[in-house]
Amino acid sequence: MTLVYQSTRDAKNTVTASQAILQGLATDGGLFTPVSYPKVDLDFDTLKDASYQEVAKLVLSAFLDDFTAEELDYCITNAYDSKFDTPAIAPLVKLDGQYNLELFHGSTIAFKDMALSILPYFMTTAAKKHGLENKIVILTATSGDTGKAAMAGFADVPGTEIIVFYPKDGVSKVQELQMTTQTGENTHVIAIDGNFDDAQTNVKHMFNDVALREKLAANKLQFSSANSMNIGRLVPQIVYYVYAYAQLVKTGEIKAGDKVNFTVPTGNFGNILAAFYAKQIGLPVGKLICASNDNNVLTDFFKTRVYDKKREFKVTTSPSMDILVSSNLERLIFHLLGNDAVKTAELMNALNTQGQYELTDFDAEILDLFAAEYATEAETAAEIKRVYESDAYIEDPHTAVASAVYKKYQAATGDAAKTVIASTASPYKFPVVAVEAVTGKSGLTDFEALAQLHEISGVALPPAVDGLETAPVRHKTTVAAADMQAAVESYLGL
């Protein structure tokens, strides 16, 4: 039986995996979400020797079950190839008291590559499957990493245009240059005077604007998303949690069946939600530890059951987590409410109109799977330094948030279970923060810091940043948040 994906806000709005990938976001504003979980044979005696691509085939064929085996082989083979700088794709590194799952070996040195390398292949395959003649317009808001990874994936892919919005003052210099120097005739990058939540909210509004959808259709265009709101972004992220567990079995760190914790730096809630789905298909997970920075709306939610976005937005050194409206939490809320779309829609409406909601009647077993804590800016910098002094290993600030939060969790609970930290970006993406934390040197430019980081770490400068300083800037547009739709219509000639 084909797996059903349902909107979190309307039980009657159901689609297959390929349809969900093409649509991106449900027309009612909800997110397409599995209402049941596929059966997956997680035999770690076999999986411990499997390649990343083989684990991907096992997981993806279960969740994307209206794709044929040949179609998935095509997608996987083209996605996980020499774009990654290691055959392991996502190597697991043992440090003192923790394991870092390095998700930054792709072409843009951030974890978004893990899913955005394969999403274009999913999308073009799904379009062919459904005889779609419209051009797909990928409309995406980014807090720094998704935008570049999405453009790298979709650049010059026939039948697509991609438009990326990012907060002008909410990304690192390296992140901004990675985006604004992006090549590809079909790529468009626009800075906004506002924060990520402004960008994401306006993108959602455009998806839900019936008049705009009709105008697009009349011009043989349709929107889809490269954000983790798209199930085609989320499902590939399940793969690396299964792969990490298999590596722990292979190296004798655990026995098959032992429970493992995962600590995940969290902004939009997609990465940790993928770990939750891994648990649902049988991965032996102990705790999922949700790590936030000073924008600690999720920490408060898990501790109080109240989600309240009415708070100061803080710009931090871990910008990909500078988010107050965590979109993918809606999927977890849906599951916590027993897949009740009516109740989920009510809570999301309350968030939209009143700025908060309270979870009162929920599945306690699901919620108990999560722990949550946050790390301040000072704690994040101190953790980068501690890990360097302990292991001669440099974490990026997002990974350091997770690492610091894990230490707090351990101190509070005494939980001795083996724990994997999702290491979501290379320190080369945030060189100023990394170098300042390790050496105390301040006032460096990004490019001075890149050279220093290379000297300190001994790790080669990745192609993603090598030559960035002299690359021509192709995208120079900045608009007010309120003018985002006008910019989209202008680019598309509507």
Where in the sequence are the language-model features?
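PLP-dependent amino-acid enzyme catalytic core
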Residues: 1-494
